[in-house]
C-alpha cells in the first residue's frame, strides 16, 4: 500500500481536469460475453462496423483479437513519450470476418443440415475461447476483457497527422473527430493494444467512446449511467469512476493499495483501464495433493501486468488471510461491493 501523498501520485494528462478510469477484477470474469453483446448492440451493429468489437473478452493465454495483437508494435519507446515505436496494421483476416449463417435454410426451408457459417472462417474475435495451456491437472486459462484504455499518453493521438484524435478536457476520454478523420489509419498502427478500428464504409477510424453519452446523462430521463459494458456485467467485475477521486474505489485500488494494474505497462501509454490480476487454485502433484505452486505462473502474469503484479497478488493474499482470521478489509470490501452508487462514481465532479 502506497505511503505517498495521494495528490502526488495521480498523473493527469496536460489539459485534462479529471481522468475517468475503469477497474476490472479478473477473478470475477466468467467469459459470458454480456459486455461484448451490450457494446456491440449499442455502438457497432452495422455500417462498416460488422467486424468491430470495441469491447471483447479474450481467453489468456491466447492470440487475442485481433490475432497476435501483442506482437503488432506501437506505443512509445520510453516513458519520456518523445518517440513512438513502429507498429503494424492488422490484416482483415486477423480480426475475422463477420460470420453469416444459414438461418434461412434451417428455419424456413426445412433443411436437415446443422446451423453453420456459410463461409469457411479461419479466425474470429473469440476463436480460441476456453483453450488453456499446461498439463493436466495443472492446466489453466482465464478471461481478459478489453476496451480502449483511454490512455494518459495515447500514442494514437500523436500518430494522427490530422489531429483528429484528442483527449476530452473534462474527463480524459479519448475520441476521434469524425469530421477531421480521413482514414489514414496511422492511429491503428500506433495503438499498441489495437483498439482503434478502420471503418471501410465510412472511410474513418472508430473506437470505444467510454459510452460518454451515458455518463453525461444524455438519455431520455437525464440520468447518469456507467458504460454499457460495466452496467450489464452479470458478475459485476467492473468499477468505474475517476482516478483523481480520492474517496472512490478506483483511486484506492490503483494508487493506495496498488492492486489494480495496467495491461502491458511497457507500452508506456499509461492506460486508464486497470486489472485486478487473477488468482487460481494451487497446482497438484501426481498423487493429487496440493502443492505450494501457483497454477497461473507468476512469470506469465508479469508479462501481462509488469513486475508490480507480485506485490499486488501478495497484498490481496494478505487481506484474504486477514478476513479468514475474522478481521475486516477495506480492500476486499471494495472488490465485493455490489452497490452501484459506490461501484460507479461518475458525478463527484459535476459542480466543477
Curated annotation (Swiss-Prot):
EC code: 1.7.5.1
GO biological process: anaerobic respiration; nitrate assimilation
A GO CC term attached to the entry: plasma membrane
Spans through the membrane: none
Cofactor, how bound (note): Binds 3 [4Fe-4S] clusters per subunit.
Annotated binding of [4Fe-4S] cluster 3, by residue: 148, 151, 156, 191
Annotated membrane topology: Peripheral membrane protein
Annotated segments matching region Disordered: 63-95, 111-131
Catalysis: reaction(s): nitrate + a quinol = a quinone + nitrite + H2O
Cofactor(s) in the UniProt record: [4Fe-4S] cluster; [3Fe-4S] cluster
Residues engaged in binding [4Fe-4S] cluster 2: 39, 208, 211, 229
Main location per the UniProt record: membrane
Induction details: By nitrate.
Stored SUPFAM superfamilies: 4Fe-4S ferredoxins
Keyword Iron: yes
Record bears the keyword Repeat: yes
Field pH dependence: Optimum pH is 8.2. At 40 degrees Celsius (temperature of natural environment) the optimum pH is 7.9.
Binding residue positions for [4Fe-4S] cluster 1: 29, 32, 35, 233
Top-level EC class as recorded in UniProt: oxidoreductase
Ranges for domain 4Fe-4S ferredoxin-type: 20-48, 139-170, 172-201
Annotated compartments: Cell membrane
InterPro entries cross-referenced by the UniProt entry: 4Fe4S_Fe-S-bd, DMSO_Rdtase_II_Fe-S_su
Subunit structure: Probable multiprotein complex; a catalytic heterodimer of an alpha and beta chain is proposed to associate with additional subunits involved in membrane attachment and electron transfer.
Biological function: The respiratory membrane-bound nitrate reductase enzyme complex plays a role in generation of metabolic energy by using nitrate as a terminal electron acceptor during anaerobic conditions. The beta chain is an electron transfer unit containing four cysteine clusters involved in the formation of iron-sulfur centers.
Protein name, per record: Respiratory nitrate reductase subunit beta
Amino acid at each position: 500500500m502506497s505511503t505517498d501523498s495521494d495528490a502526488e501520485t495521480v498523473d493527469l494528462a496536460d489539459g485534462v481536469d479529471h481522468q475517468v478510469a475503469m477497474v476490472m477484477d479478473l477473478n470475477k470474469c466468467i467469459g459470458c460475453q454480456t459486455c461484448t453483446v451490450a457494446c456491440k448492440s449499442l455502438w457497432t451493429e452495422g455500417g462498416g462496423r460488422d467486424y468491430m468489437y470495441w469491447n471483447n473478452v479474450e481467453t489468456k493465454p491466447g492470440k487475442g483479437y485481433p490475432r497476435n495483437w501483442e506482437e503488432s508494435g506501437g506505443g512509445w519507446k520510453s516513458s519520456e513519450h518523445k518517440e513512438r515505436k513502429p507498429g503494424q496494421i492488422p490484416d482483415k483476416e486477423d480480426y475475422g470476418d463477420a460470420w453469416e449463417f444459414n438461418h434461412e435454410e434451417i428455419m424456413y426451408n426445412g433443411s436437415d443440415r446443422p446451423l453453420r457459417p456459410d463461409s469457411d472462417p479461419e479466425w474470429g474475435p473469440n476463436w480460441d475461447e476456453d483453450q488453456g495451456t499446461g498439463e493436466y491437472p495443472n492446466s489453466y486459462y482465464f478471461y481478459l476483457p478489453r476496451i480502449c484504455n483511454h490512455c494518459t499518453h495515447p500514442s494514437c493521438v500523436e500518430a494522427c497527422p490530422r489531429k483528429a484524435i484528442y483527449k476530452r478536457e473534462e474527463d480524459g476520454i479519448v475520441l476521434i473527430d469524425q469530421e477531421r478523420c480521413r482514414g489514414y489509419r496511422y492511429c491503428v498502427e500506433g495503438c499498441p493494444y489495437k483498439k482503434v478500428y478502420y471503418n471501410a464504409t465510412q472511410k474513418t477510424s472508430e473506437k470505444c467512446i467510454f459510452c460518454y453519452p451515458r455518463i453525461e446523462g444524455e438519455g431520455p430521463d437525464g440520468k447518469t449511467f456507467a458504460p454499457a459494458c460495466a452496467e450489464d456485467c452479470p458478475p459485476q467485475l467492473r468499477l468505474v469512476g475517476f482516478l483523481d477521486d480520492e474517496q472512490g474505489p478506483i483511486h484506492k485500488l490503483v494508487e493506495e493499495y496498488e492492486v489494480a494494474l495496467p495491461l502491458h505497462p511497457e507500452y508506456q501509454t499509461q492506460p486508464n483501464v486497470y486489472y485486478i490480476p487473477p488468482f487460481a487454485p494451487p497446482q497438484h502433484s501426481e498423487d493429487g495433493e496440493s502443492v505450494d505452486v501457483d497454477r497461473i505462473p507468476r512469470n506469465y502474469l508479469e508479462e501481462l501486468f509488469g513486475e508490480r503484479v507480485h506485490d499486488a497478488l501478495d497484498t490481496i493474499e494478505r487481506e484474504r488471510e486477514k478476513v479468514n482470521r475474522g478481521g475486516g478489509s477495506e480492500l476486499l470490501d471494495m472488490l465485493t461491493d455490489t452497490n452501484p452508487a459506490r461501484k460507479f462514481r461518475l458525478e463527484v465532479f459535476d459542480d466543477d
